[in-house]
Amino acid sequence: MAAAAAVATISAVQVEFLEFPAVVTSPASGRTYFLGGAGERGLTIEGKFIKFTGIGVYLEDKAVSSLAAKWKGKPSEELVETLDFYRDIISGPFEKLIRGSKILPLSGVEYSKKVMENCVAHMKSVGTYGDAEAAAIEKFAEAFKNVNFQPGATVFYRQSPDGVLGLSFSEDVTIPDNEAAVIENKAVSAAVLETMIGEHAVSPDLKRSLASRLPAVLSHGIIV
């Protein structure tokens, strides 16, 4: 009798009309990443929840062994309530690629203003905001100045363990060959992901997705 095929631990995620593939390769970094989780980001306006962005967090394969050491065997219900789990994703010694694709049109200035406000508020709250971070935030703002996001357009954030934040922009979901800006500031880089999945997360949906998907990967490895 033939052995049963291994059950996939990684699959694509659909957020509105946006599909987040299970695995992507970045021509900018030459690395391949698996989809940790994806979810929507929105705001309640006049009593109605409006979805603006779909966010996907992709992780380098070495994230599995790094996270499994502490979190393997933990159920989703526990992980989703555990801030340290998300902080270990944010600060872990592996590369991340965050994809933010627009559901509604948004100017780069509007989008980046909110991201920067959240990042600065977090850094000030934990005491990591100084002159170097202020300069890095200015560079972040400059990168978005001439960008206008139509539905489906995307910003990619590449985060390296040594604190480099690479930004690239696409009119669709194609990862560009070259990055539009590179910001070398560990506190700012970490703050971008912290504001998405940390204590005051802009996407609780993304947090739930990470907590529901990663236990299988940590227990059985990456199976596509």
Curated annotation (Swiss-Prot):
It catalyses: a chalcone = a flavanone. The record marks 111 as: Important for catalytic activity. Signal peptide: none annotated. It comes from the Eukaryota. Its EC number is 5.5.1.6. Pathway: Secondary metabolite biosynthesis; flavonoid biosynthesis. Substrate binds at residues 53, 118, 195. Gene3D superfamilies: 1.10.890.20, 3.50.70.10. It is an enzyme of class 5 (isomerase). GO terms for molecular function: chalcone isomerase activity. It holds the Pfam family Chalcone. One of its GO terms (biological process) is flavonoid biosynthetic process. Keywords: Flavonoid biosynthesis, Isomerase. Belongs to the chalcone isomerase family. PANTHER family: CHALCONE--FLAVANONE ISOMERASE 1A (PTHR28039:SF10), CHALCONE--FLAVONONE ISOMERASE 1-RELATED (PTHR28039). Part of the biosynthetic pathway for all classes of flavonoids, a large class of secondary plant metabolites, many of which are brightly colored. Catalyzes the intramolecular cyclization of bicyclic chalcones into tricyclic (S)-flavanones. Responsible for the isomerization of 4,2',4',6'-tetrahydroxychalcone (also termed chalcone) into naringenin. This is Chalcone--flavanone isomerase. It comes from Pueraria montana var. lobata. The gene is CHI.
